[in-house]
């Protein structure tokens, strides 16, 4: 409640509330996202909401249907969070619940793609290398738009953690660029009238000169 009251007061009293709120955030924590911030983070983490928002804003498409994610096409096309590397396949190679660290990596948000509901129902547990190869053939730009590494070696299950490392870097870089653009503010310079200059008086940058022209009439 105290932080909320402070933020509301900032909005009400500041001539530039957006910049003022950004300053408050910057003082409390860094605005930069690092690849390590994604490690072991599941879809409940705020970074996933930010990723989803960013992907929709840049025109990302469903990997299976090619439909733009930001279009509302009815209940069958509601957006869902799909494992790129199916959990059933990861579990077979040691990423099950018996190993908490590995399990967290299997559920990491960087192992998620945004698909429409109808696409998610048909994908099942296809190996990532087969699925992503098919996606690249049908929709060449789809992987890039969802910040998915393009190196096919990373799609093999034995290279799963290399895939995570690479996608963390891609997401961190692109989200930072995105945040920088939406948080950048331009300083507005108000025009100064001649009357204001005269009222201000002379200074190091302004000197009044007397004129040699006289109206003798």
Predicted features along the sequence, with ranges:
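Short, flexible loop/turn elements at secondary-structure junctions
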Residues: 83-88, 120, 210-212
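A general structural signal for short secondary-structure junctions and capping/turn motifs
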Residues: 70-72, 103-107, 196-199
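Long, cytosolic, alpha-helical-rich C-terminal regions that act as interaction/scaffolding modules
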Residues: 117-185
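Active-site-proximal structural scaffolding
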Residues: 44, 74-78, 105-109, 164, ...
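Short glycine-/polar-rich loops that comprise or flank the Walker A/P-loop
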Residues: 110-112, 127, 143, 203-204
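Intrinsically disordered, low-complexity N-proximal targeting/linker segments that flank membranes
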Residues: 1-84, 89
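Short beta-strand-alpha-helix junction that forms the catalytic/metal-binding core
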Residues: 79, 91-121
């Amino acid at each position: 409640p105290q932080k909320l009251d402070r933020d509301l007061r900032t909005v009400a009293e500041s001539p530039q509330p957006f910049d003022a709120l950004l300053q408050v955030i910057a003082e409390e924590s860094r605005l930069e996202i690092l690849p390590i911030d994604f490690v072991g983070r599941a879809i409940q983490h705020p970074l996933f909401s930010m990723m989803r928002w960013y992907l929709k804003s840049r025109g990302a498409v469903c990997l299976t249907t090619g439909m733009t994610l930001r279009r509302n096409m009815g209940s069958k096309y509601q957006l869902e969070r799909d494992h790129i590397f199916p959990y059933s396949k990861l579990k077979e190679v040691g990423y099950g619940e018996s190993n908490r660290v590995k399990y967290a990596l299997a559920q990491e948000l960087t192992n998620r793609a945004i698909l429409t509901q109808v696409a998610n129902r048909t994908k099942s547990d296809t190996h990532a290398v087969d699925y992503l190869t098919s996606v690249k053939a049908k929709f060449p730009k789809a992987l890039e738009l969802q910040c998915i590494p393009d190196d096919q070696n990373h799609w093999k299950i034995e290279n799963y953690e290399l895939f995570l490392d690479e996608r963390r870097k891609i997401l961190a870089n692109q989200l930072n660029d995105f945040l920088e653009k939406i948080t950048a503010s331009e300083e507005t310079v108000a025009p100064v009238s001649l009357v204001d200059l005269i009222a201000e008086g002379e200074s190091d940058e302004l000197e009044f000169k007397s004129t040699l022209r006289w109206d003798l009439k």
